[in-house]
């Protein structure tokens, strides 16, 4: 896959899966051996995590603005401005996420290091694993 195609996959993940909390694209966007360095359980773990967030925190809203997408080889780095709201609390930050892709799918995902702390500011605690 070209770097432009890899960037398109990452953009779709951020804009659809994260912003819309939509797990229906996980099988299409993630490789079967997908590893997320924040959410345990691989692809199936992520598919369970998204609806868990929706049911546990019905007021939770994400708006992730992609500032830059930079690709080299099989890696894409995204500079993202995150805005989370939940139960009247808001948190905003800008950080980097890194993705490794193979055959048009995300194989590995290093979410921004401050994601868990940012979610905690709006009352959301991530599972450990």
Predicted regions and their residues:
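C-terminal and inter-domain tail/linker signature
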Residues: 1-129
């Amino acid at each position: 896959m070209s770097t432009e195609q890899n960037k398109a996959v990452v953009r779709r993940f951020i804009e659809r899966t994260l912003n819309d909390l939509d797990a229906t694209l996980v099988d299409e966007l993630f490789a079967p051996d997908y590893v997320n360095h924040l959410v345990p359980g691989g692809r199936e773990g992520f598919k369970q995590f998204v609806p868990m967030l929706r049911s546990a925190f019905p007021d939770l809203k994400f708006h992730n603005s992609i500032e830059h997408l930079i690709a080299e080889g099989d890696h894409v780095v995204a500079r993202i401005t995150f805005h989370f709201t939940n139960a009247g609390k808001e948190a905003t930050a800008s950080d980097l996420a890194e993705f490794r892709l193979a055959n048009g799918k995300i194989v590995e995902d290093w979410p921004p290091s401050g994601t868990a702390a940012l979610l905690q500011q709006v009352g959301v605690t991530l599972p450990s694993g």
